[in-house]
A protein has these predicted regions:
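A short, flexible loop at the N-terminus of ABC-type nucleotide-binding domains that lies
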Residues: 1-4, 9-23, 28
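The feature captures the beta-strand-to-loop junction immediately N-terminal to the Walker
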Residues: 35-37
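Catalytic Walker B motif of ABC-type/P-loop ATPase nucleotide-binding domains
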Residues: 132-136, 141
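H-loop/switch region of ABC-family ATPase nucleotide-binding domains
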Residues: 164-165
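Hydrophobic anchor residue at the start of the ABC signature
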Residues: 121, 138, 149
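ABC-family P-loop ATPase nucleotide-binding domains
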Residues: 11, 70-123, 127-128
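ABC ATPase nucleotide-binding domain signature region
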Residues: 31-32, 43-93, 172-182
């Protein structure tokens, strides 16, 4: 089942005009990449799809469980401690495939930004969401971590939304793209 936005309008408080105006868009199963210049509304659109923001007008039909991985790698996932205690096959597989040590969730604040980002994605995937929304997932990670991340994201079978300036990732992961311009 897709995420469907119908005639959505959104403006931040004190804005002189809406950032998003009368947008209708369907995020189908598979990966949709959001492209556009900085400040054009990609992250805002992703947050609307995730349910972190609500539109002033229009409707959004969301899936039962949507996982959000923010651009800020230092934002610890809500289920981080649950993942730290989990040793089910999926948790073990994600730790192995993303080269995450068992103690890393317990020392999240001391990890590098790249390790934090991998943990954000691992926790999100471990929760088996219907939709996964990622904002700049390859920022702060090295080439090997990027490859690991791509491999686990390619296995995701739900509705995926990817905000990124990483053209190679977009080309390898994206099934479709939505391009945005400011104004």
């Amino acid at each position: 089942m897709p995420i469907v936005l119908s005639d959505v309008t959104f403006a931040y408080p004190r804005a002189t005009k809406p950032l998003i105006h009368n947008l209708s868009l369907t995020f189908a199963i598979g990966w949709t990449c959001l492209l556009g210049d900085n400040g054009c509304g990609k992250t805002t659109l992703a947050k609307l799809a995730a349910g972190l923001l609500e539109p002033q007008q229009g409707t959004i039909q969301r899936l039962d469980y949507v996982a959000w991985c923010p651009q800020d790698p230092q934002q610890a996932p809500e289920a981080l401690l649950d993942f730290a205690c989990a040793y089910d096959p999926l948790a073990r597989s994600l730790r192995s495939r993303l080269a995450l040590q068992d103690d890393m969730p317990w020392r999240f604040a001391q990890l590098s930004c790249g390790e934090q980002k991998k943990l954000q994605v691992a926790v999100a995937l471990w929760q088996q969401p219907d939709a996964l929304i990622l904002d700049e997932p390859t920022n702060h990670i090295d080439h090997q971590a990027r490859r690991q991340l791509l491999e686990v994201l390619q296995q995701f079978k739900g509705t995926g939304i990817l905000v990124s300036h990483d053209r190679q990732l977009l080309g390898l992961l994206g099934n479709r793209c939505a391009c945005f311009e400011q104004g």
